[in-house]
From Swiss-Prot:
Organism of derivation: Drimys granadensis
Domain of life where this protein originates: Eukaryota
Subcellular location: Plastid, Chloroplast
Record protein name field: Small ribosomal subunit protein uS15c
GO cellular component, one term: ribosome
InterPro entries, per the entry: Ribosomal_uS15, Ribosomal_uS15_bac-type, uS15_NS1_RNA-bd_sf
Amino acid sequence: MVKNLFISVIPQEEKEKNKGSVEFQVFNFTNKIRRLTAHLEFHRKDYLSQRGLRKILGKRQRLLAYLSKKNRVRYKELIGQLDIREPKTR
């Protein structure tokens, strides 16, 4: 597993203050998603991890939708920092 995949965009002092913020939650979900993706490259038949990955992806998608409605500027900054594609709109 490559450690460069995990991002440290948020400084340590901000991590301690804002653990409940939307940005921090999306940041944590992104790290979990990248870790699970790396795991699933080696263990293709780990169906429980696949299910967990889909659940985390859904949670992150809902948080990003909330953030895009509330504050579009912070949403664009976060997507740029975490290198996440913007979801397609229906």
